[in-house]
Amino acid sequence: MHSEAREAEARRLLLQETLDAERTFLERNQWGQFATPPSLAGEIMRYTIDLHEETRINFLEPSCGSGSFFSALLRNLGDKKIEHAVGVELDPRFSKAASDLWTGQGLRVIEGDFTSPSLVSGPVASLLVANPPYVRHHHLGIDQKRDLVARCADQLGIKPSGLSGLYLYFVLLSHRLLRADAVSTWLIPSEFMDVNYGTALKEYLATRVQLVRIHQYDAAEVQFDDALVTSSVVVFRNSPPRPGHTAEFSFGGTLSEPKVTHQIPSAALTPEAKWSRYVTGVMPADINLKQTGPKLSDFFKIRRGLATGSNAFFIIPRSEAERLGIKRNFLRPILPSPRKLKGDAITADASGWPDIPEQLALLDCPLPIEDLLLENPALAAYLSTADEKIRGGYLVSKRSPWYKQEQREPAPILLTYMGRGKDDQHPLRFIRNDSDAVATNMYLMLYPTALLQRYLAGDPERIKQVHKALLAITAADLRGGGRVYGGGLHKMEPKELAALPADGIATLDPVLREDISMVSVPPRKRTGRPQMPGPSASEVRAWARANGVCVPDRGRLRPEVWDAWRQAHAGEASPLNIDAGDQVALW
């Protein structure tokens, strides 16, 4: 059996290479076809078989491809025996290949969609191992997504997000095919631990089954040559979580020799939390993951940088713009790629442009083309060189005129949107911007809230102290707050940045912390004594409108609206005059 399995595996590898070459990378990406390397398949199978306590195995491999995991099963059986083995594959080329290779070894290959409710009836599997298709949601049809979501909700009472990748539905819809206490192992992207659409899978792992282990491979050691994703192995048993049970979270190295290992009580696993923190150990399990102290959102409004629609066309060297004769009032200073900024601070020259070797200009003009021809023929001539690809782009085609950019003020603080960094090296950089330059969407732009603006207004040098406090945020906090992709690429979204702790800023001045508590203290429970009156949201909303402040018809009011109300009513019976022990919530 071993020699036959080795010979079949050698044929499989050659066939896999041939079949992969028949499709372009884009086509394989749309199918989610990323073959499991044989060494990785063997490592996963050895670990999983050891968890299978019964001698007889009923094996199921969803999206079996050419049969990499079945091949690994044959090579690592030991004293166990295969009673039944089923592989499911949608691609007819691979289903035929797997059938030709492995039917003689006991694998029954079913050609079809694994998520189809009628394809396989269950429960059939005591052992399931899979590398499901990594198909992103935008490659799934609307009706297909609606059907998948509905069946997950019907079978498990769990409703996934429409942004979920196909792999998430594979895991959830496999539940009906698992025997009691079956071992189920999945090689899937690590993103589910951190993104919002991974909540459904985390709910399943935390509440419906007994999670055994999640091992996240080091992002710098990409497991697939043709897929820039960070991979994790997720292992669970089909049995309810037991009181006192702990799950193993490990990182880096291999399954048998990880770099880091943590035991996390199942009771501590909440679907809403970022589970990558358990993997890396950034956030111990006994700490409440809900941030209760000051957050960056208390001090900054965070927005993505400008999306021009075509940086190569709309952003040109300032010297080139001046050589062409483009007037200065149609040029806005804009920062280059983060790679070209060596320090953590950008100073300004006498004109307000960033003091860097190559200054870049963003072309921005509100005039219609007929007026522009008269006002600045040189700019009109340059714009006439835009090809149809630029003019027909989504962002450009929605603008009027098409060369007018989004209006954005320079931000005093920037964060690089993506970056790399291991151990204590920060993957992302906070940059102080003393110039008049705006930034592209390679950055996040941090604008001080009214609360922080009041502090900064007292001394122009205070922005340096705020920047220093941001630089003190640890590399671990940045990694724990963001997400990581294959090759060690880290990314931070605005909401993730907003949720990072900001104690370092709050401690710069006692007034800052007091102002935060004034708008964030939870309401006191009612007691026998009456509470001092405070303004209702409707009262503040009415006052704001009467004073020309734009506020929404319903929902939470922005903190700066409350700030403005308090300043206008200083000395009256307002929450500012209530003793600290009797403060009430303002929003």
Swiss-Prot record:
Catalytically driven reaction(s): a 2'-deoxyadenosine in DNA + S-adenosyl-L-methionine = an N(6)-methyl-2'-deoxyadenosine in DNA + S-adenosyl-L-homocysteine + H(+)
InterPro entries: DNA_methylase_N6_adenine_CS, E3-bd_dom_sf, Lsr2_DNA-bd, MethylTrfase_TaqI-like_dom, N4_N6_ade-DNA_methylase, SAM-dependent_MTases_sf
Pfam families: Eco57I, Lsr2_DNA-bd
GO MF term (any one): site-specific DNA-methyltransferase (adenine-specific) activity
Domain of life: Bacteria
Annotated GO biological process: DNA restriction-modification system; methylation
Stretch forming the signal peptide: none
E.C. designation(s): 2.1.1.72
PANTHER family: DNA METHYLASE (MODIFICATION METHYLASE) (METHYLTRANSFERASE)-RELATED (PTHR33841:SF5), DNA METHYLTRANSFERASE YEEA-RELATED (PTHR33841)
Function in brief: A gamma subtype methylase that recognizes the double-stranded sequence 5'-GTCGAC-3', methylates A-5 on both strands, and protects the DNA from cleavage by the SalI endonuclease.
Family: Belongs to the N(4)/N(6)-methyltransferase family.
Protein's name according to its UniProt entry: Type II methyltransferase M.SalI
Organism: Streptomyces albus G
Species classification: Bacteria, Bacillati, Actinomycetota, Actinomycetes, Kitasatosporales
Gene, per the UniProt record: salIM
